[in-house]
Amino acid sequence: MNVMNQYISKSEQLQTLMNTLDKDNQNVLLSGVTTSFYAPLLQMIFENKKRPMIIMMQNLYHAQRLYDQLIDLMDMNSVRLFPMDEFITAEMLASSSELRIERMNTLASIIENQNKIVVTHVAGATRFLTPKEIFKQADIQLEVGGTYELDELKRKLVELGYQSVRAVEHMGEFSVRGGILDVFPMTEENPIRIEFFDDEIDTIRYFSTETQRSINKVEKAALVPTFELVYSDEQVERFEKNIKERLTKTAPLVEGETRDNLYARIYGDIEKIKNNQDLEVMHKYISLLYEKPDTLLSYFDDPLVIYIDYNRILENQEHMNEDALAWQEGAIENGKTVVVIT
Protein backbone atom coordinates (compact mmCIF):
# COMPACT_ATOMS: atom_id res chain seq x y z
CA MET A 1 0.00 0.00 0.00
CA ASN A 2 1.48 3.35 -1.03
CA VAL A 3 1.60 6.46 1.15
CA MET A 4 -1.55 7.99 -0.35
CA ASN A 5 -3.54 4.78 0.14
CA GLN A 6 -2.36 4.58 3.74
CA TYR A 7 -3.46 8.15 4.34
CA ILE A 8 -6.89 7.60 2.78
CA SER A 9 -7.45 4.30 4.59
CA LYS A 10 -7.08 6.03 7.95
CA SER A 11 -9.52 8.85 7.19
CA GLU A 12 -12.85 8.98 8.97
CA GLN A 13 -14.51 10.17 5.76
CA LEU A 14 -13.57 6.93 3.99
CA GLN A 15 -15.04 4.82 6.76
CA THR A 16 -18.22 6.90 6.68
CA LEU A 17 -18.44 6.39 2.92
CA MET A 18 -17.94 2.63 3.23
CA ASN A 19 -20.59 2.40 5.94
CA THR A 20 -23.03 4.35 3.78
CA LEU A 21 -22.47 1.98 0.88
CA ASP A 22 -22.97 -1.01 3.18
CA LYS A 23 -26.29 0.29 4.46
CA ASP A 24 -27.89 1.81 1.41
CA ASN A 25 -26.20 0.03 -1.51
CA GLN A 26 -26.66 3.31 -3.33
CA ASN A 27 -24.87 5.24 -6.01
CA VAL A 28 -22.41 7.91 -4.92
CA LEU A 29 -21.79 11.55 -5.77
CA LEU A 30 -18.19 12.57 -5.13
CA SER A 31 -16.94 16.14 -5.17
CA GLY A 32 -14.53 18.37 -3.32
CA VAL A 33 -11.81 15.71 -3.38
CA THR A 34 -8.28 16.59 -4.46
CA THR A 35 -7.87 15.31 -8.03
CA SER A 36 -4.90 13.11 -7.19
CA PHE A 37 -6.95 11.35 -4.47
CA TYR A 38 -9.72 10.05 -6.74
CA ALA A 39 -7.81 7.11 -8.21
CA PRO A 40 -6.56 5.61 -4.91
CA LEU A 41 -9.95 6.27 -3.32
CA LEU A 42 -11.77 4.43 -6.11
CA GLN A 43 -9.26 1.60 -5.94
CA MET A 44 -9.95 1.15 -2.24
CA ILE A 45 -13.72 1.23 -2.74
CA PHE A 46 -13.45 -1.39 -5.49
CA GLU A 47 -11.25 -3.70 -3.44
CA ASN A 48 -13.49 -3.28 -0.40
CA LYS A 49 -16.86 -3.73 -2.10
CA LYS A 50 -15.82 -6.30 -4.71
CA ARG A 51 -18.56 -5.30 -7.13
CA PRO A 52 -18.57 -3.72 -10.60
CA MET A 53 -18.15 0.05 -10.66
CA ILE A 54 -18.98 2.64 -13.30
CA ILE A 55 -17.21 5.95 -12.81
CA MET A 56 -18.98 8.86 -14.49
CA MET A 57 -16.86 11.86 -15.42
CA GLN A 58 -17.95 15.15 -16.97
CA ASN A 59 -16.10 14.71 -20.28
CA LEU A 60 -13.67 12.55 -22.24
CA TYR A 61 -10.60 14.47 -21.07
CA HIS A 62 -11.32 13.90 -17.39
CA ALA A 63 -12.32 10.27 -18.01
CA GLN A 64 -9.06 9.56 -19.84
CA ARG A 65 -7.01 11.24 -17.13
CA LEU A 66 -8.66 9.24 -14.34
CA TYR A 67 -8.29 6.02 -16.32
CA ASP A 68 -4.56 6.65 -16.77
CA GLN A 69 -4.20 7.19 -13.02
CA LEU A 70 -6.10 3.99 -12.19
CA ILE A 71 -4.00 1.94 -14.61
CA ASP A 72 -0.92 2.97 -12.64
CA LEU A 73 -2.46 1.49 -9.49
CA MET A 74 -4.41 -1.55 -10.67
CA ASP A 75 -4.30 -4.55 -12.97
CA MET A 76 -5.28 -3.60 -16.52
CA ASN A 77 -7.93 -6.34 -16.53
CA SER A 78 -9.63 -4.61 -13.59
CA VAL A 79 -9.94 -1.18 -15.21
CA ARG A 80 -11.47 -0.24 -18.56
CA LEU A 81 -12.29 2.96 -20.41
CA PHE A 82 -15.49 3.50 -22.40
CA PRO A 83 -14.77 6.65 -24.46
CA MET A 84 -16.95 8.45 -26.96
CA ASP A 85 -16.47 11.46 -29.22
CA GLU A 86 -18.26 14.45 -27.74
CA PHE A 87 -19.10 16.39 -30.90
CA ILE A 88 -22.54 15.81 -32.34
CA THR A 89 -21.16 15.67 -35.89
CA ALA A 90 -18.91 12.81 -34.83
CA GLU A 91 -21.89 10.85 -33.51
CA MET A 92 -23.98 11.46 -36.62
CA LEU A 93 -21.19 11.02 -39.16
CA ALA A 94 -18.22 8.97 -38.04
CA SER A 95 -16.24 8.75 -34.83
CA SER A 96 -12.63 7.95 -34.03
CA SER A 97 -11.65 4.37 -34.86
CA GLU A 98 -9.29 4.35 -31.87
CA LEU A 99 -12.14 5.19 -29.50
CA ARG A 100 -14.35 2.58 -31.16
CA ILE A 101 -11.70 -0.11 -30.70
CA GLU A 102 -11.41 0.89 -27.04
CA ARG A 103 -15.19 0.63 -26.60
CA MET A 104 -15.34 -2.78 -28.28
CA ASN A 105 -12.56 -4.09 -26.05
CA THR A 106 -14.39 -2.76 -23.01
CA LEU A 107 -17.71 -4.35 -23.97
CA ALA A 108 -16.04 -7.69 -24.69
CA SER A 109 -14.25 -7.47 -21.34
CA ILE A 110 -17.53 -6.77 -19.51
CA ILE A 111 -19.22 -9.74 -21.18
CA GLU A 112 -16.34 -11.95 -20.07
CA ASN A 113 -16.20 -10.65 -16.49
CA GLN A 114 -18.27 -7.81 -15.03
CA ASN A 115 -16.18 -7.37 -11.88
CA LYS A 116 -14.15 -4.32 -12.90
CA ILE A 117 -14.06 -0.54 -12.90
CA VAL A 118 -15.25 1.12 -16.11
CA VAL A 119 -14.49 4.81 -16.48
CA THR A 120 -16.75 6.76 -18.83
CA HIS A 121 -18.30 10.19 -19.31
CA VAL A 122 -21.61 11.70 -20.37
CA ALA A 123 -21.31 10.91 -24.09
CA GLY A 124 -20.18 7.35 -23.38
CA ALA A 125 -22.80 6.60 -20.75
CA THR A 126 -25.70 7.89 -22.86
CA ARG A 127 -24.68 6.18 -26.11
CA PHE A 128 -27.25 3.62 -27.23
CA LEU A 129 -25.89 0.08 -27.63
CA THR A 130 -27.08 -3.19 -29.07
CA PRO A 131 -29.04 -5.06 -26.37
CA LYS A 132 -26.62 -7.00 -24.20
CA GLU A 133 -28.04 -10.46 -24.86
CA ILE A 134 -27.88 -9.94 -28.63
CA PHE A 135 -24.31 -8.65 -28.40
CA LYS A 136 -23.29 -11.66 -26.28
CA GLN A 137 -24.60 -14.08 -28.88
CA ALA A 138 -23.00 -12.28 -31.81
CA ASP A 139 -19.40 -13.38 -31.38
CA ILE A 140 -17.88 -16.31 -33.26
CA GLN A 141 -16.23 -19.01 -31.17
CA LEU A 142 -13.66 -21.09 -33.06
CA GLU A 143 -11.86 -24.20 -31.83
CA VAL A 144 -9.28 -26.55 -33.30
CA GLY A 145 -11.05 -29.72 -34.41
CA GLY A 146 -14.37 -27.92 -34.77
CA THR A 147 -16.35 -28.11 -38.00
CA TYR A 148 -17.33 -24.86 -39.72
CA GLU A 149 -18.52 -24.01 -43.20
CA LEU A 150 -16.10 -21.41 -44.54
CA ASP A 151 -18.70 -19.59 -46.65
CA GLU A 152 -20.96 -19.30 -43.61
CA LEU A 153 -18.07 -17.92 -41.56
CA LYS A 154 -17.40 -15.30 -44.23
CA ARG A 155 -21.06 -14.26 -44.20
CA LYS A 156 -21.06 -14.04 -40.41
CA LEU A 157 -17.89 -11.93 -40.39
CA VAL A 158 -19.49 -9.45 -42.79
CA GLU A 159 -22.54 -9.26 -40.50
CA LEU A 160 -20.22 -8.42 -37.60
CA GLY A 161 -18.70 -5.56 -39.59
CA TYR A 162 -15.46 -7.18 -40.77
CA GLN A 163 -14.22 -6.09 -44.19
CA SER A 164 -13.01 -8.54 -46.82
CA VAL A 165 -9.56 -7.57 -48.12
CA ARG A 166 -6.76 -9.19 -50.12
CA ALA A 167 -4.33 -9.16 -47.21
CA VAL A 168 -5.12 -8.48 -43.55
CA GLU A 169 -3.31 -5.46 -42.11
CA HIS A 170 -5.72 -3.77 -39.71
CA MET A 171 -8.26 -4.67 -37.04
CA GLY A 172 -11.66 -5.56 -38.45
CA GLU A 173 -10.33 -7.11 -41.68
CA PHE A 174 -10.39 -10.68 -43.00
CA SER A 175 -9.19 -12.51 -46.09
CA VAL A 176 -9.66 -16.00 -47.49
CA ARG A 177 -7.15 -17.90 -49.62
CA GLY A 178 -8.15 -21.45 -50.36
CA GLY A 179 -8.62 -23.17 -47.01
CA ILE A 180 -6.96 -20.40 -44.99
CA LEU A 181 -8.89 -17.67 -43.18
CA ASP A 182 -6.97 -14.67 -41.85
CA VAL A 183 -8.87 -12.38 -39.52
CA PHE A 184 -7.85 -9.49 -37.25
CA PRO A 185 -10.15 -9.42 -34.19
CA MET A 186 -10.88 -6.14 -32.43
CA THR A 187 -9.63 -7.52 -29.12
CA GLU A 188 -6.21 -8.77 -30.22
CA GLU A 189 -2.84 -7.16 -30.92
CA ASN A 190 -2.15 -9.53 -33.82
CA PRO A 191 -4.30 -11.22 -36.47
CA ILE A 192 -5.23 -14.90 -36.45
CA ARG A 193 -4.65 -17.46 -39.20
CA ILE A 194 -7.11 -20.35 -39.27
CA GLU A 195 -6.22 -23.30 -41.49
CA PHE A 196 -8.96 -25.71 -42.55
CA PHE A 197 -8.84 -29.33 -43.63
CA ASP A 198 -12.11 -29.60 -45.53
CA ASP A 199 -14.60 -28.08 -43.04
CA GLU A 200 -12.53 -28.87 -39.94
CA ILE A 201 -10.18 -26.37 -38.31
CA ASP A 202 -6.69 -27.85 -38.37
CA THR A 203 -4.74 -25.03 -36.68
CA ILE A 204 -5.28 -21.58 -35.19
CA ARG A 205 -2.26 -19.34 -34.81
CA TYR A 206 -1.42 -15.68 -34.32
CA PHE A 207 0.85 -14.18 -36.96
CA SER A 208 2.70 -10.94 -37.71
CA THR A 209 1.29 -8.64 -40.39
CA GLU A 210 4.82 -7.47 -41.20
CA THR A 211 6.62 -10.80 -41.57
CA GLN A 212 3.59 -13.12 -42.02
CA ARG A 213 5.37 -15.49 -39.64
CA SER A 214 3.53 -17.38 -36.93
CA ILE A 215 3.79 -16.08 -33.37
CA ASN A 216 2.09 -18.85 -31.42
CA LYS A 217 -0.57 -21.52 -31.74
CA VAL A 218 -3.80 -21.54 -29.75
CA GLU A 219 -6.64 -24.00 -29.38
CA LYS A 220 -9.49 -21.46 -29.37
CA ALA A 221 -10.27 -17.99 -30.67
CA ALA A 222 -13.17 -15.57 -30.26
CA LEU A 223 -14.13 -13.08 -32.96
CA VAL A 224 -16.18 -10.22 -31.52
CA PRO A 225 -18.19 -7.63 -33.49
CA THR A 226 -16.26 -4.68 -34.93
CA PHE A 227 -19.01 -2.20 -34.06
CA GLU A 228 -21.50 -1.77 -31.22
CA LEU A 229 -24.23 -2.13 -33.85
CA VAL A 230 -25.22 -5.78 -34.30
CA TYR A 231 -28.54 -6.81 -35.82
CA SER A 232 -30.49 -9.55 -37.59
CA ASP A 233 -32.89 -9.59 -40.54
CA GLU A 234 -35.74 -9.03 -38.08
CA GLN A 235 -34.19 -5.77 -36.91
CA VAL A 236 -33.60 -4.70 -40.51
CA GLU A 237 -37.31 -5.10 -41.24
CA ARG A 238 -38.15 -3.06 -38.15
CA PHE A 239 -35.68 -0.36 -39.18
CA GLU A 240 -37.00 -0.11 -42.75
CA LYS A 241 -40.58 0.24 -41.53
CA ASN A 242 -39.66 2.89 -38.95
CA ILE A 243 -37.40 4.96 -41.19
CA LYS A 244 -39.99 5.06 -43.98
CA GLU A 245 -42.63 6.26 -41.51
CA ARG A 246 -40.32 9.08 -40.46
CA LEU A 247 -39.50 9.87 -44.07
CA THR A 248 -43.22 10.26 -44.81
CA LYS A 249 -43.50 12.74 -41.92
CA THR A 250 -40.39 14.66 -42.96
CA ALA A 251 -40.92 14.96 -46.72
CA PRO A 252 -43.62 17.70 -46.51
CA LEU A 253 -41.21 19.87 -44.49
CA VAL A 254 -38.79 20.26 -47.40
CA GLU A 255 -39.19 20.65 -51.14
CA GLY A 256 -37.47 20.46 -54.50
CA GLU A 257 -33.87 19.32 -54.62
CA THR A 258 -33.69 19.13 -50.82
CA ARG A 259 -36.54 16.60 -50.78
CA ASP A 260 -34.92 14.59 -53.57
CA ASN A 261 -31.65 14.51 -51.65
CA LEU A 262 -33.47 13.40 -48.52
CA TYR A 263 -35.08 10.45 -50.30
CA ALA A 264 -31.78 9.49 -51.90
CA ARG A 265 -29.96 9.66 -48.58
CA ILE A 266 -32.52 7.64 -46.62
CA TYR A 267 -32.92 4.92 -49.24
CA GLY A 268 -29.14 4.78 -49.52
CA ASP A 269 -28.91 4.28 -45.76
CA ILE A 270 -31.51 1.51 -45.93
CA GLU A 271 -29.28 -0.35 -48.39
CA LYS A 272 -26.23 0.23 -46.20
CA ILE A 273 -28.04 -1.26 -43.21
CA LYS A 274 -29.10 -4.26 -45.29
CA ASN A 275 -25.53 -4.80 -46.51
CA ASN A 276 -23.79 -4.09 -43.17
CA GLN A 277 -21.95 -1.09 -44.59
CA ASP A 278 -20.72 2.07 -42.82
CA LEU A 279 -21.89 0.71 -39.49
CA GLU A 280 -20.25 3.49 -37.47
CA VAL A 281 -22.31 6.07 -39.38
CA MET A 282 -25.42 3.88 -39.33
CA HIS A 283 -25.24 3.73 -35.53
CA LYS A 284 -27.40 6.87 -35.50
CA TYR A 285 -30.34 4.62 -36.44
CA ILE A 286 -29.96 2.18 -33.53
CA SER A 287 -33.22 3.31 -31.89
CA LEU A 288 -35.03 2.35 -35.11
CA LEU A 289 -33.46 -1.11 -35.14
CA TYR A 290 -34.32 -1.99 -31.54
CA GLU A 291 -37.38 -1.17 -29.49
CA LYS A 292 -35.22 -0.80 -26.38
CA PRO A 293 -31.51 -0.28 -27.03
CA ASP A 294 -29.22 -0.75 -24.06
CA THR A 295 -26.64 1.61 -22.60
CA LEU A 296 -23.36 0.89 -20.86
CA LEU A 297 -25.17 0.65 -17.52
CA SER A 298 -27.41 -2.11 -18.92
CA TYR A 299 -24.37 -4.32 -19.58
CA PHE A 300 -23.90 -4.72 -15.81
CA ASP A 301 -26.18 -6.61 -13.42
CA ASP A 302 -25.67 -4.57 -10.25
CA PRO A 303 -23.02 -1.88 -10.67
CA LEU A 304 -22.05 0.81 -8.20
CA VAL A 305 -22.20 4.09 -10.11
CA ILE A 306 -20.00 6.89 -8.85
CA TYR A 307 -20.51 10.40 -10.22
CA ILE A 308 -17.51 12.68 -9.88
CA ASP A 309 -18.35 16.39 -9.90
CA TYR A 310 -22.06 15.78 -10.50
CA ASN A 311 -22.97 19.41 -11.26
CA ARG A 312 -20.46 19.51 -14.11
CA ILE A 313 -21.89 16.25 -15.41
CA LEU A 314 -25.38 17.78 -15.49
CA GLU A 315 -24.07 20.91 -17.24
CA ASN A 316 -22.34 18.85 -19.89
CA GLN A 317 -25.45 16.73 -20.40
CA GLU A 318 -27.51 19.87 -20.93
CA HIS A 319 -25.03 21.25 -23.47
CA MET A 320 -25.03 17.93 -25.35
CA ASN A 321 -28.83 17.91 -25.50
CA GLU A 322 -28.86 21.47 -26.83
CA ASP A 323 -26.26 20.63 -29.48
CA ALA A 324 -28.17 17.52 -30.53
CA LEU A 325 -31.42 19.48 -30.90
CA ALA A 326 -29.71 22.21 -32.93
CA TRP A 327 -28.08 19.62 -35.19
CA GLN A 328 -31.39 17.80 -35.68
CA GLU A 329 -33.23 20.97 -36.68
CA GLY A 330 -30.54 22.01 -39.15
CA ALA A 331 -30.24 18.52 -40.61
CA ILE A 332 -34.00 18.31 -41.22
CA GLU A 333 -34.01 21.68 -42.98
CA ASN A 334 -31.15 20.56 -45.22
CA GLY A 335 -32.63 17.17 -46.05
CA LYS A 336 -30.01 15.19 -44.14
CA THR A 337 -32.19 13.37 -41.65
CA VAL A 338 -35.78 12.60 -40.70
CA VAL A 339 -37.95 13.84 -37.87
CA VAL A 340 -38.28 12.04 -34.56
CA ILE A 341 -41.75 10.56 -34.10
CA THR A 342 -43.00 10.79 -30.51
Region spans (language model):
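ASCE RecA-like P-loop NTPase motor cores
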Residues: 1-342
